[in-house]
Amino acid sequence: MRVNKESLQMNTYISLHGWWRTSLLRAV
């Protein structure tokens, strides 16, 4: 399986997005 630089960047973005979103939900 070959990984694109774009795919990797998108994955990182989604991971970070999901992380801060989860933190926000926990804070509320």
Curated annotation (Swiss-Prot):
<dbReference type="InterPro" id="IPR013205">
    <property type="entry name" value="Leader_Trp_op"/>
</dbReference>
<dbReference type="GO" id="GO:0000162">
    <property type="term" value="P:L-tryptophan biosynthetic process"/>
</dbReference>
<keyword id="KW-0822">Tryptophan biosynthesis</keyword>
<dbReference type="Pfam" id="PF08255">
    <property type="entry name" value="Leader_Trp"/>
</dbReference>
<comment type="function">
    <text>This protein is involved in control of the biosynthesis of tryptophan.</text>
</comment>
<protein>
    <recommendedName>
        <fullName>trp operon leader peptide</fullName>
    </recommendedName>
</protein>
<keyword id="KW-0028">Amino-acid biosynthesis</keyword>
<keyword id="KW-0057">Aromatic amino acid biosynthesis</keyword>
<keyword id="KW-0428">Leader peptide</keyword>
